[in-house]
């Protein structure tokens, strides 16, 4: 569930809160109180040891028993105060570690603005019409003729394809005649589920692969921001 919380909300809560100064002050005061109680218990124990031999009678024994019970309470109280101080100290350390891991709100805003700017500018160039041919156009291999009713005319017009050059294009035309007739290009492959000559779909071009890498990088950045981990 914490991954669904916006990064800005967590960052604002951490950086705009009261910080750990009050917890640190409480830890110091509790440690001082624990030391004071422990010192009082030690002093009372020393006094009881000195008076134990001189006290006689039932009243003295009753007072000594009450003093021993009070001494036991002071010792337990001192240990409890010290444990509380240690718990507060661990909370302070956890807060400081979390503060180091959480990205500041200003940095998150700048990163998101940078991502929007990169998406809008489209540094990969995939959306610039000047760098792309219209859909359905085919760039044929120079010096090669294609019949109007041949395999190239049956390709899906939505898939912009490029005719792949074939090694040895100047070879004997009879060597390129098979059971299916003359083939302007060697081999067959599938383009959007339709058979055709050996053509390279636009999905295999370096420009498309660069676009895919760019969008993958953007998704990784957004995931990193959601995880709220500051790079060290």
From Swiss-Prot:
It holds the Pfam family PPE. Residues 123-147, 169-200 are annotated as: Disordered. GO terms for biological process: response to host immune response. GO terms for cellular component: plasma membrane. Transmembrane segments: none annotated. InterPro entries: PPE_dom, PPE_sf. PANTHER family: GLUTAMINE-RICH PROTEIN 2. Belongs to the mycobacterial PPE family. This is Uncharacterized PPE family protein PPE58. It comes from Mycobacterium tuberculosis (strain ATCC 25618 / H37Rv).
């Amino acid at each position: 569930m914490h991954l669904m919380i916006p990064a800005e909300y967590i960052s604002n809560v951490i950086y705009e809160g009261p910080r750990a100064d009050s917890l640190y002050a409480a830890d110091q005061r509790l440690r001082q109180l624990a030391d004071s109680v422990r010192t009082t218990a030690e002093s009372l124990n020393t006094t009881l040891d000195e008076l134990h031999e001189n006290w006689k009678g039932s009243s003295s024994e009753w007072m000594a028993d009450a003093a021993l019970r009070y001494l036991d309470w002071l010792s337990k109280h001192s240990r409890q105060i010290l444990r509380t101080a240690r718990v507060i100290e661990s909370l302070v350390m956890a807060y400081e570690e979390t503060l180091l891991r959480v990205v500041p709100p200003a940095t998150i805003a700048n990163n998101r603005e940078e991502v929007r700017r990169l998406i809008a500018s489209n540094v990969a160039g995939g959306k610039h019409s000047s760098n792309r041919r219209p859909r359905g156009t085919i760039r044929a291999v120079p010096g090669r003729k294609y019949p109007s009713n041949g395999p190239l005319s049956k390709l899906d017009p939505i898939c912009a394809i490029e005719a792949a050059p074939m090694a040895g294009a100047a070879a004997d035309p009879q060597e390129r005649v098979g059971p299916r007739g003359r083939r302007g290009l060697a081999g067959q492959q599938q383009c959007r589920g339709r058979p055709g000559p050996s053509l390279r779909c636009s999905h295999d071009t370096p420009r498309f692969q660069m676009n895919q890498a760019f969008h993958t990088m953007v998704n990784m950045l957004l995931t990193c921001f959601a995880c709220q981990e500051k790079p060290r």
